Swiss-Prot record:
Gene encoding the protein: J328L
Full protein name: Protein MGF 300-4L
Family, per entry: Belongs to the asfivirus MGF 300 family.
Lineage of source species: Viruses, Varidnaviria, Bamfordvirae, Nucleocytoviricota, Pokkesviricetes
Misc. comment: Encoded by variable regions comprise the left 35-kb and the right 15-kb ends of the viral genome. Transcribed in host macrophages.
């Protein structure tokens, strides 16, 4: 197993990214000042001085290391270790690794058990199916899961989106958690098992395929987007494309946007305005080009050849000289 130091070393990219990443967290500890000059090592005691203040206001460097590890903040941990923090503190307070063995639902799971499961990223369909069966047989599981999706921005956005469609959202959040993991990691076998076991109740004109399509949009999983799209009828397909492009324009999902466009979606003025509102310049550029919308914007006079010059921004899109379109 890699030491925390090695993990942090691999995670670290540059100092500027580190400082911006930790600004909000360190603000709560009184360590933040202007220009992201956040933490300073005390020359007298070797601990951390907030805002470059004098010795006497220092925070114990090992205490801050414990805080960093408990928050999975390896960027901060790396800097503290470089400054002489004791790595034993990091290992002692490291969160236990999840138990990969199948859990048999003989008894009610404790919140600690659920946390172990929720932190696991699942490496195979069988593991996710096992967890799904455990969740399905337990009581009061949603309270245990709540901590997870409230602390995970990606999961929180996903859940907020699903709440619009499903009547059983709160009572079946364990179900959506498993769907979320299956779509995220491309587990077809697990997804098939989960959707056969239970189908939630939706609001009017919403189907499971629509929700699964939006889940695939969330992760820009083009293969699954097309699969769920072609399983739906024409009315549902139109809603899929409308919601999918709106999602892409809001969150800057370029592959999702282009895939919806190739499936028949419209790069409309409405989508352009949605992207403009959220400062999604790539989507604005695509709307302007694909929808032939002549609007002054940061990507004015965009053409296929300019896009090819900036192809690293458009990868993995492929440009066809024959049709003058971009494809997935």
């Amino acid at each position: 197993m890699l030491s925390l130091f090695n993990i942090a070393l691999k995670t670290l990219k540059n100092h500027i990214e580190f400082l911006k990443h930790d600004k909000d967290i360190l603000t709560h500890l009184g360590l933040c000042c202007k220009n992201y000059d956040l933490i300073h090592k005390c020359s007298e005691c070797g601990n951390i001085c907030p805002n470059r203040q004098q010795h006497g206001t220092c925070i114990n460097i090992n205490y801050l290391l414990i805080y960093a590890v408990k928050c999975d903040n390896y960027m901060l941990a790396y800097r503290l270790l470089c400054w002489g923090a004791n790595e034993k503190f990091a290992h002692y307070f490291r969160r236990p690794l999840p138990n990969l063995k199948p859990l048999l639902p003989k008894k009610e799971l404790t919140p600690k058990d659920i946390k172990q499961l929720a932190y696991e990223h699942f490496y195979s369909d069988s593991e996710l199916i096992t967890v799904f069966e455990v969740f399905r047989r337990c009581r009061n599981i949603n309270d245990c899961l709540e901590f997870f999706y409230k602390k995970n921005l990606e999961f929180e956005i996903y859940f907020a989106r699903l709440h619009v469609y499903s009547k059983t959202f709160y009572r079946k959040s364990w179900y959506w958690f498993c769907i979320f993991m299956a779509v995220k990691h491309g587990m077809k076998q697990a997804l098939k098992k989960i959707t056969k076991t239970y189908i939630p109740t939706f609001y009017n004109k919403t189907t499971l395929n629509l929700v699964l399509f939006l889940s695939a949009c969330f992760y820009e999983n083009v293969e699954w987007m097309k699969y769920f799209f072609y399983k739906a009828n024409k009315k549902i397909q139109q809603r899929m494309l409308s919601y999918g492009m709106e999602w892409a324009a809001t969150h800057g999902k370029v592959r999702t946007f282009v895939c919806c466009y190739t499936l028949g979606g419209t790069a409309s003025l409405k989508m352009y305005q949605k992207a403009y509102q959220n400062e999604r310049y790539m989507i604005m550029a695509l709307c302007s080009y694909l929808g032939n919308i002549q609007i002054n914007n940061p990507w004015d006079n965009l053409n296929p050849y300019m896009m090819m010059q900036n192809k690293e921004k458009f990868l993995p899109l492929k440009f066809s000289e024959e049709t003058q379109y971009f494809y997935i």
